[in-house]
């Protein structure tokens, strides 16, 4: 476990091969990083955890795997990374197969995952990309591009900006705050569109939502 003094929000950059990343944001003046093997009884997970390098310089926290000496020795192993950091911090995560969980209020978030589940309580702007897996955001405070090839997308509350949601196979659910004016442009090849937005004012809307799926339903509603 490593601790860094961080009186202001930081930029956290993650690059792990597989496993789980948990980011816990709160009102605090330090950042704590804990890296563990996903299964302490598996040697490849232990080696994967040992390869994770943690650095902090000029407001940027990096948690990333060093390249193994031999890339062709089979599975790279899985790790569990938990980071506690100041609220409002920015996050960038890239991984082949991992679940990414954000607790508390974060700033701008960028996630690129081949396979896994992504869930955030609250973000500012977001760019979330999966090949396979579900994406959930509790409160989305800015513009976003959110997509998965196979999986469901759920935004409990979008506030402002341009939000683009797309999946090839899965349902899309998006909610807006009662005071938010919003418009919806939605399309599904095999499914239904349910538009329950109440505050729609055309081009002057504070929030524009574009949602598309090939196989699935699209539901939009004012909370």
Feature annotation, model-predicted:
Residues 138-223:
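Short, surface-exposed interaction patches in beta-rich subdomains
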